[in-house]
Each structure stands twice: as C-alpha cells, then as structure tokens.
Amino acid sequence: MMSSVTSEIIHTDVSGQRVRPPLTYCNGELGLKNSEDAAYFCLEKFKSFNEVPDFQYIYLTLSLHVPPPTRKYLLKFHKRLLNVCRLCGETGDLVGGRVLVSGVSQKTADIVVSAKSNGEVLYDWSNFFKSTVRVRCRYTIAKLYNNKAAMREIAKQKNWQTTYPNLEAYRKLNDAAKNSKHTPIVSIQTPPPPAPTPNRPDVPASKNVVITQRYQKPVEKIEDSRLETTRISVIPLLSVLLLVIIIILL
C-alpha cells in the first residue's frame, strides 16, 4: 500500500483574502536514515516563521492507495485512519467532528467520515474501489511540533512530504502587516537564548588547600574536646563507685 503525507499551508493576507504562496518541498528521504529525524528536520523550518502574521495552521494530508476492499483490509484501514485523525485538531480529535476523505478514481467521490462521541467512525464507501483516498487534518503548528505521538505517526508513512512556504513571500506580507493596523498572530514562540555565565577567574590549587585545612581543623578540635570531657566525667564516677563498694564491704 502506497501512502504519503503532504501538507498545505492556508494563509490570509492583511485584507483577509486567502493567499497560496509558492511552496517548496521537504521530502522525507533527505538522506537521513531515520524518517522521524527527517520529519523533525522539516518542522524546524516552521520555527523560523514566528514573525509571520497569521501563520498558525498546517494541513497535513494522508494519501492512501485503496485496493478492492476486503473485510480484513477495511479493519486495518479503519485503525490506521483513526490513528492519524485522532491526532488532528487542537483537541486531538477530528476537526469539527468530521474529516472529508476524497476518493479519486474514474469518478471523484467524497467519503465522509463522521466521529460520534463514543468514538465510532462511520464510512460512506460509495465509489471507493481502486481509488486513492486523501484524509486532510488540521494541526496547530506549535502543538504539532510538541506532539511526539503525531510526529511518530507521520514518520511511519513510507513516502511523505511536508511543504513549507517561501520565506521571501512571507516577509513581504509581514512588512505589509507591520505598516497596517493588523495584529500578527504568532503561534510559535522561540525561547530566548540562555544568558551567558560570567567568566570567573580560576582559583589556584594552593588556595583551595588552605581553605580545606581551615575548615577541617576546628572539626577535629571539637571531636577531641568532646572525648576529653567524656574522659573527665567518667573518672570521678568510677572513684565514687569504688568508695561506696569499700564502705559496704567494711
């Protein structure tokens, strides 16, 4: 079964019109052995868009080639579709309770997958044979980057692609937004770099020796003084006991 994951960037400009900027592709292969590393490599690109207005959501599309379905295969597909779609959206469920799955064959068909409160998923399998099914789910980029379960699910796909927009096109939109009354919506906050630690002069080894000796000597003296006090207190007690015994014997 051939499968792939792609993404579509939905962006609106300052006037509210929907914009489709030129896209460049970040393939899952990338010469990296681990596909999960490749997925994180692609999402690193998104972190650089924190100054871009309205850059909030990414739409990941899972494409599955569907052979003539048998009951066994439908159960596998059902489970796999659930694993992908339950990671979608801000609450981790299907976006708005529904996911549109479009099957492309000789005739274009829409298969509606609706999720009930008990987790049951219903399919409309009309015109589903020998088609390619595409499931589109909406992710919040910041939450997707922090969601390791979603990243693992994306990395399981054999041939997936993550698209990200041309930075130059977005910078122009960002400059236009700064000159208007539009408030940029920032979904990814990059943490500030850690403050540099002040350089401390190295302390010579001889000074360390002196300091340790200073703190060790009083401790030894305290222990010795305690021993001496115990010895002094034991001697008169023994002498008194001896005197009492002698008097009793006499």
Curated annotation (Swiss-Prot):
<keyword id="KW-0812">Transmembrane</keyword>
<feature type="compositionally biased region" description="Pro residues">
    <location>
        <begin position="190"/>
        <end position="201"/>
    </location>
</feature>
<keyword id="KW-0472">Membrane</keyword>
<feature type="transmembrane region" description="Helical">
    <location>
        <begin position="230"/>
        <end position="250"/>
    </location>
</feature>
<comment type="similarity">
    <text>Belongs to the ascovirus HvAV ORF18 family.</text>
</comment>
<feature type="region of interest" description="Disordered">
    <location>
        <begin position="182"/>
        <end position="205"/>
    </location>
</feature>
<keyword id="KW-1133">Transmembrane helix</keyword>
<protein>
    <recommendedName>
        <fullName>Uncharacterized protein ORF12</fullName>
    </recommendedName>
</protein>
<dbReference type="GO" id="GO:0016020">
    <property type="term" value="C:membrane"/>
</dbReference>
